[in-house]
Design a protein with these regions (language model features):
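Structural preference for beta-rich elements and adjacent junctions enriched in aromatics
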Residues: 40-425, 436, 797
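Glycine-rich phosphate/diphosphate-binding loops that line cofactor/substrate pockets in enzymes
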Residues: 250-251, 378-384, 425-433, 539-544, ...
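The substrate-binding groove and active-site-proximal loops of carbohydrate-active enzymes
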Residues: 358-365, 409-412, 440-444, 476-477, ...
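A generic structural motif
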Residues: 194-198, 263-265, 440-444, 476, ...
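Bacterial Sec-dependent N-terminal signal peptides
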Residues: 1-44, 822
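Short, solvent-exposed loop/turn segments at the edges of secondary structure
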Residues: 125-127, 141, 319, 417, ...
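Exposed, low-structure sequence patches enriched in small/polar residues
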Residues: 369-371, 377, 448-450, 463-822
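Outer-membrane beta-barrel transmembrane domain signature of Gram-negative proteins
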Residues: 226-248, 396-463, 580-622, 643, ...
Length: 822
């Protein structure tokens, strides 16, 4: 009854907040009606139909070019937003029944000064570039980007309208291009097949279009249709491509079978060969939706995670690097309840609870085996976005061994598991939207179930100056009895103009838990957040542009309803005309009553107030040698605890193809205080005063053999140690009392050393050959090393190596059909 009463009180608290937000919104509407609305005429360009395909050779000599009217008069995005571009650009558009053709003349008064660096695919590096964004539905919600550098390096991006615009560089398409540098500048020709786009057969209307050109030596970014930098997002600030009509969407069907082989070795065991094979399939169900299926996937060649020593009560977050889960997954990010790294991650259960007398764990799998994954996603011409993602992993077993008899047996640490995510999203007027999403995890032969349902919305006014946004979610998880929790958030913001600001309130109950298929650091909290932001985008004095913000958070626990902390901070970012950048950020945290550091429900530790600041400086990245410096400092004024941290990064380009990067990071915390241990009954909680030192070295090298082949090497060593000096017992009032009876050694010395070397060759459109070498060594002990080189030698004692070759071949149904017809 007490919990229900507490929950009802929180609902009333949120209701009062909503009522306040409504009154604020009425005030905003009054302000809006008193102001002149921003209006901008969209540019248009006509696409001409052609009967003979253009030859993609970087020469604009076909007769069709004399008949077409080019798109021109580009304007600056940076540094002088809205003023004419420093160099003229003309772009021509054509189409036939299979593709859109783009021909562009990028004039340059100094062709020998064009930044013509060659890089790997999907990376412009520091090269000049030209690109087009095509929005077939002309709704300002989704656009397909095709970019090219003077060296012919292709970059394809899918931009999605969200809170701002998210550019998905993991999206890949198969298209043709050719560039050529002349005495007048450089020339681009593209052939973008309709199979790379999603559009409606019925709609003979204008498509959304914008073009971008970057001239590196001027640090100048330009667009065809004006993109007002005082307005959040760029997709809805597009022009129009007219004239495309009577086009039937092609069959979108492709297969990408792969074969791979691995030679793997670990110290103390024999090297073994592994062979894998599988298939990726993409099928356009209709004009709007695409099926993407992966059978028996192989992720053995992705870059190693940057592992770290984690002394916090929160799970470390690692970004997704598997292409299937990064490409075309923008819909599934609605609601914030999907974290794709859960799929195929480490087993959910441990074999410890299944051990019998005299048994030990002989082997435990580090990850579950994913056997297939399927996603269906798309958006209709009426603005309905629908996505379904499903994945399955096999049962995972640990091996336990009887130390007396030597007998071994398997213990299930995760049954056959099904993961499912479903989302429905509706685009509304003024680039607004509302979404509903559900995630579900079920295990066959196990009663455990986890289910989360969430909604998210953002409503903008006509001028897109103000917005109301919100989220809500309910989680239910368990086996025989289910634990249910709730999440709610509501905010109002002004996100247009030099001055922007916002306020929001969220509430997360103590039983809300989306982490079976999502990621949430902590629940059981209520946060009121307010912020104000100001930007100057026009150059003045020695400054090219600058911006700054001030923010404040008031955090309380949900249960019990007590203060957690109050934080106030700010940020200043300045870019100078010489392309140097300076950043300062800092915050002040009042006394914190931390209920998470203790690892025991209902217990808290009182952190003394502290402040922190960071200084960052980077030099001109256009130069062959560019540098980055960082210094950070944190201090508790009433105690002897403080922290110093620093970073140094250097990037060196040698010629047009070779680049070196070096990063050195160091962090030293003196007399830090944190959790160490607790007894079985959780009545005794041990903290320690400790010194924590961390050091990281990262060396990266990339060499472009051509615009279709590259070699990349990345080596990283991370070393972190925690030396406990004084042990304490946590008291009921959150204070500490020195404990002279605690004798266990809880020091930590952690090392992670990884090497990733990869040769990638795109030997045919959509096809690739990848050769990879991966080396990994990890060491975790309770004896703190003081000498760097002896510590590194000890780390290398337990290494694993993997040498692999993978061939993936792209087969397009339309190409096969065309060859058969011919």
């Amino acid at each position: 009854m007490q919990n229900k009463t507490l929950f009802i009180s929180k609902i009333l608290h949120l209701t009062v907040f909503i009522f306040t937000m409504k009154r604020l919104q009425l005030l905003f509407i009054t302000i809006i009606l008193s102001l002149a609305l921003f209006a901008q005429t969209k540019k248009t360009v006509q696409a001409l139909t052609i009967s003979t395909p253009l030859t993609i050779d970087g020469i604009l000599d076909e007769p069709a070019y004399k008949l077409a009217t080019p798109a021109k008069d580009f304007v600056q995005l940076q540094p002088h937003n809205g003023k004419p571009a420093m160099q003229p650009t003309e772009a021509y558009y054509f189409y036939d029944q299979s593709a859109i053709y783009v021909g562009a003349m990028l004039h340059d008064s100094a062709p020998d000064s064009i930044f013509n660096y060659m890089t790997e695919r999907d990376n412009t590096g520091m090269a000049d570039y030209f690109g087009v964004y095509i929005d077939p539905y002309n709704q300002g919600q989704l656009a397909y980007g095709f970019f090219i550098t003077p060296a012919g390096v292709q970059v394809d991006i899918k931009a999605v309208k969200s809170d701002g615009d998210n550019e998905d560089g993991n999206w890949n398409a198969v298209w043709e291009s050719k560039t050529r540098i002349t005495d007048k500048g450089w020339v681009v020709e593209m052939r973008i097949p309709f199979s790379a786009l999603r559009f409606s057969e019925k709609a003979n209307k204008a498509w959304g279009l914008n073009m971008f050109r970057n001239i590196r030596r001027y640090s100048s970014n330009n667009s065809w249709n004006l993109v007002d930098r005082n307005v959040s997002g760029f997709i809805h600030q597009e022009g129009q491509l007219e004239g495309i009509k009577d086009i039937k969407p092609p069959v979108r069907l492709s297969f990408s079978p792969y074969l791979s082989t691995y030679l793997e070795s670990k110290k103390g065991s024999k090297a073994e060969f592994l062979y894998k094979g599988g298939l990726d399939l993409k099928y356009g169900i209709n004009e709007s939706f695409t099926l993407d299926m992966m059978l028996i996937p192989d992720f053995g060649q992705i870059q190693s995670d940057d592992k770290k020593l984690n002394l916090s009560p929160y799970e470390l977050y690692y970004s997704e690097k598997r292409q299937f889960f990064t490409e075309g997954t923008e819909l599934f990010n609605r609601g914030g309840i999907f974290y794709s790294r859960r799929i195929g991650s480490s087993p959910k259960f441990s074999a410890d609870n299944s051990l019998r007398e005299n048994e030990v764990i002989d082997y435990s799998p580090s990850e579950t085996q994913l056997i297939n994954a399927t996603k269906i996603s798309g958006r209709t011409n009426k603005g309905w976005g629908i996505g379904v993602l499903n994945a399955m992993s096999l049962e995972s077993n640990a091996q336990v061994k009887d130390t007396l008899t030597g007998k071994e047996r398997n213990v299930s640490v995760q049954p056959f598991t099904n993961y499912n995510v479903t989302v429905v999203d509706k685009s509304l007027k003024n680039n607004s939207y509302v979404s509903l999403i559900n995630s579900n995890v079920s295990m066959f032969g196990n009663p455990f179930r986890a289910n989360v349902t969430a909604t998210e919305f953002q409503i903008r006014n006509k001028s897109k100056t103000y917005a109301i946004s919100g989220k809500g979610a309910i989680s239910s998880r368990g086996d025989s009895t289910y634990e249910t929790g709730y999440y709610a958030k509501l905010g109002v913001e002004k996100n247009k103009g030099k001055l922007q600001y916002g306020i929001s309130q969220n509430m997360i109950t103590d039983k809300y838990n989306p982490n079976d298929l999502g990621y949430l650091q902590r629940n059981n909290q209520m946060t009121t957040e307010a912020w104000i932001y100001y930007q100057i985008i026009e150059p003045f004095w020695i400054i090219r542009e600058c911006n700054g913000n001030i923010w404040s958070d008031h955090n309380r626990m949900y249960n019990p309803n007590t203060l957690y902390d109050n934080i106030t901070g700010g940020n200043l970012n300045v870019t100078f005309k010489n392309n140097y950048n300076f950043n300062f950020n800092g915050y002040y945290n009042m006394d914190r009553y931390d209920y998470y550091e203790t690892r025991v429900k209902g217990r808290f530790f009182k952190f003394a107030h502290f402040y922190s600041y960071n200084l960052n400086l980077s030099t001109d990245s256009r130069k062959p040698l560019s540098l980055y410096f960082h210094y950070g400092y944190a201090k508790q004024p009433t105690t002897d605890q403080y922290q110093n941290s620093g970073d140094f990064q250097a990037t060196m380009r040698l010629g047009q193809r070779l680049q070196f990067d070096y990063l050195f990071s160091i962090s030293n915390t003196t007399n830090g205080v944190g959790y160490v241990d607790k007894n079985d009954s959780e009545s005794s909680i041990t903290f320690a005063k400790r010194n924590v030192n961390s050091m990281e070295n990262v060396i990266s090298t990339s060499y472009a053999l051509s615009n279709k082949a590259s070699i990349n090497l990345r080596a990283r060593h991370y070393w972190s140690s925690a030396k406990n000096n004084i042990y304490y017992l946590l008291q009921q009032d959150g204070s500490l009392m020195e404990d002279l009876t605690y004798t266990e050694n809880k020091d930590q010395n952690y090392n992670a050393f990884t090497v990733d070397m990869m040769l990638k060759w795109n030997f045919a459109p959509g096809s690739e050959l990848v050769m990879a070498w991966k080396n990994a060594a990890f060491a975790d002990q309770n004896r703190v090393e003081t000498n760097y080189w002896s510590n590194l030698r000890n780390t290398w004692l337990n290494q694993s190596n993997s040498l692999s070759v993978k061939v993936l071949y792209y087969i397009d149904f339309n190409s096969l059909k065309k060859k058969k017809t011919t």
